[in-house]
């Protein structure tokens, strides 16, 4: 067990690494040449899972297999100040989709001791030691029309490690549209929370099958720092 944990840590700790835009980054639908694709559509080589068999690359998406609670984090870099854009939908499940920011892989604890955002409608949780609660006034949920989690939605998270402010904007994708006009749904503020850590997809409990596609990250943030691209 100890050797297995060391292997996970060795594979995943790439702290503070600046991301270089990939050749195909200019092909993203957001007009930002500094966005880097996080998923090649065929395998999970850029990702590290908490458990074997929890996730799979299926039909061009990252598919949660619903086998257990756990996470899948991007292992090419860890980020503090960032822009993260993705599409999400839930195929099956009894809990909203969840993603994690500002966690840590050293040591590895439940949910990476991270701040949880629940796309696309803005639920939340604080997994940091001494917290493990809903976060109270640290989170602000903003009024918006409820987005159907069973259909594809676009979400953008922007985080500033220096200020401890992270925000999420989402919108429903219609038909074959590649993008949509987002609306801010959730804001988190705690100056003590911002840190360099992994960006992760989370399965809250067994039986949940969430899917993700079109994942892009920008760090450091060069294009419109502190502003959403998708609004």
Pin down the residues of each PLM region.
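Bacterial N-terminal signal peptides that target proteins for export
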Residues: 1-9
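Sec/Tat signal peptide C-region and signal peptidase I cleavage site
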Residues: 19-25
């Amino acid at each position: 067990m100890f050797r297995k944990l060391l292997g996970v840590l060795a594979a995943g700790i790439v702290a503070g690494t600046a991301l270089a835009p990939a050749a195909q980054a200019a092909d993203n639908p957001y007009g930002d040449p500094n966005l880097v694709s996080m998923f090649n559509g065929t395998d999970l080589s850029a990702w590290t899972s908490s458990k074997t068999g929890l996730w799979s690359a299926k039909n061009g998406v990252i598919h949660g297999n619903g086998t257990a609670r756990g996470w899948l984090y991007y292992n090419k870099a860890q980020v503090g100040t960032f822009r993260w854009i993705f599409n999400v939908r839930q195929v099956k499940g009894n809990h909203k989709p969840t993603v994690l920011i500002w966690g840590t892989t050293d040591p590895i604890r439940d949910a990476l001791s991270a701040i949880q955002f629940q796309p696309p409608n803005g639920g939340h949780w604080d997994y940091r030691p001494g917290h493990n609660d809903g976060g109270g006034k640290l989170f602000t949920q903003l009024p918006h029309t409820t987005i159907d989690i069973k259909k594809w939605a676009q979400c953008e998270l922007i985080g500033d490690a220096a200020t401890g402010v992270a925000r999420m904007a989402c919108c429903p994708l219609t038909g074959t549209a590649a993008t949509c006009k987002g609306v801010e749904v959730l804001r988190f503020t705690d100056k003590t929370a911002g840190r360099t850590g992994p960006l992760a997809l989370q399965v809250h409990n067994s039986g949940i099958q969430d899917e993700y596609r079109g994942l892009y990250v920008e760090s450091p943030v060069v294009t419109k720092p502190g502003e959403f691209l998708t609004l």
